[in-house]
């Protein structure tokens, strides 16, 4: 009754029978799924000598524990996420393929020392088609950041490195690369600093 009273205040009308019909149709659809305890399926396959390929989503620097907090996602995007997500022991992880772009991109807010907020960055964005596949939101683009790449390789235990989209850089006469950071006190480092917003590259 209270719920209905609130809806009446806002003059919100809905057909409860129709809403229930959609809900129960969804329930019946879900019942068709073949649900399994995936940790058993994956581990039995590994024990049988089969190869499992696990693909992670999002970049390593968006990892909730090891990324550029608070500009991160809500989960672990690094290799360790395969262990917690699949129920696989770390000792069972074999090869780790690190896939990276020949330039850097970022979606949304967060530190981006090599970001190009100029015509070069826009050309890179257009040539690389760096727009969100769902929203069409433009990605921020910049030169590759080698200390960040090395950090990602370290925390993921990368065994094989694969570069993609190198052809995007063919349109540029000059290609720049970040090899380190200059701290506010003038010192140089090749490690990602705790506070990265006030540094020079």
Map each language-model feature to its residues:
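Non-transmembrane, aqueous-exposed alpha-helical and coiled segments at domain scale
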Residues: 1-201
